[in-house]
Design a protein with these regions (language model features):
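Charged, often flexible domain-edge or linker segments that flank or initiate folded functional domains
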Residues: 1-310
């Protein structure tokens, strides 16, 4: 199952690679290095034929002795792990776009604290996000630190409703439900999770990544034409169903729980999970083995759909 699951992943990754671009940072492998270097803007990493990033193309002008010195900077590929999104709504007073965030903490550990800062843009039509790494701990004792962290990471949502960061107007939860049922909720990319040399890292999204999401939305109809039953437009359980409150906000179809990129990724995995059955049969597996492997892979897709939603 693991081997054929890897086959599905490789096939899907090849098709999805253009929609999940890998960027490289110019830095040394040894973060404690004292070697001075000029920072550079991140660069898009070209792809190999199999969809994997070709970081060697960016470092082609460096000799092997330079590469072997971990203290010297070079281009380091940081593949995208996940895009973080926030649903948005228009302020009923100033019409600015409000991101719906309960907290702005991206990571809050004793040795690693990452905060998503949020400021009104120049025209106050929305906000500008910025990922802040290495946020210091403030406060003399545990209670003070908790209170300070709460204030620093305060989002736009609370029990009373949604506060506009541009004009301060409070939109009640009923206002939010009205906007949702009128199909006026949007989405905005807030941050990108990447796979660094040692651990997961966070960075700001680039314009190319936001454009890829729009491109993905245009490809969904064609992709799901080859998948039985097409796009998951089936209705969600009613608001009376236990644990299902999203229909109150206009999310009344299964497909509305996913961003276009998430739906594109899920569709590609489904397509190749269906195709793997033929490949397994061609490799001489018995009928029982074919059915067992494909059933386990289908269960894995179900788990993926459960975890990969907005």
């Amino acid at each position: 199952v693991r081997a054929w699951g890897w086959w599905v992943l490789q096939q899907a990754r090849k098709e999805l690679a253009p929609f999940y671009p890998t960027y490289a940072d110019y830095e040394p492998l040894d973060k404690k290095s004292n070697v001075h270097y000029e920072p550079r803007e991140p660069r898009l990493v070209p792809l190999n034929d199999d969809g994997t990033p070709n970081i060697d193309a960016l470092n082609a002008d460096l000799d092997q002795s330079y590469i072997n010195d971990r203290a010297k900077p070079r281009w380091i590929a940081k593949p995208t792990v996940a895009y973080l999104w926030a649903r948005t709504v228009k302020c009923k007073n100033c019409r600015a776009t409000i991101p719906l965030l309960k907290t702005r903490w991206l990571c809050k550990k004793s040795n690693r604290r990452v905060l998503l800062s949020m400021e009104p843009n120049a025209h106050k039509t929305g906000v500008v996000f910025d990922v802040q790494n290495y946020v210091p701990i403030v406060g003399g004792n545990a209670a003070q630190r908790r209170e300070q962290d709460k204030r620093m990471g305060e989002g736009t949502m609370s029990r009373s409703g949604v506060k506009c960061p541009c004009c301060g107007t409070i939109m009640t939860m009923e206002d939010l439900r009205v906007e949702g049922k009128a199909d006026r909720l949007g989405m905005a990319m807030t941050a990108v999770v990447v796979d660094g040399p040692k651990t997961k890292e966070f960075r700001d999204p680039v314009s190319n990544e936001c454009a890829k999401s729009e491109e993905a939305a245009q490809m969904l109809a064609e992709l799901f034409e080859v998948i039985p039953f097409g796009l998951p437009t089936e209705p969600l359980p009613s608001k009376e169903a236990l644990g299902f409150r999203v229909p109150l906000y206009g999310l009344d179809q299964w497909q509305k729980l996913f961003t276009p990129l998430q739906m594109l990724a899920l569709g590609n995995v489904v397509k190749h999970t269906r195709a793997v059955k033929t490949v397994i049969e061609q490799n001489g597996y018995s009928k029982e083995w074919v059915e067992s492997i494909t059933a386990m892979l289908a269960i894995s897709v179900d788990k993926l759909a459960d975890r990969q939603s907005a």
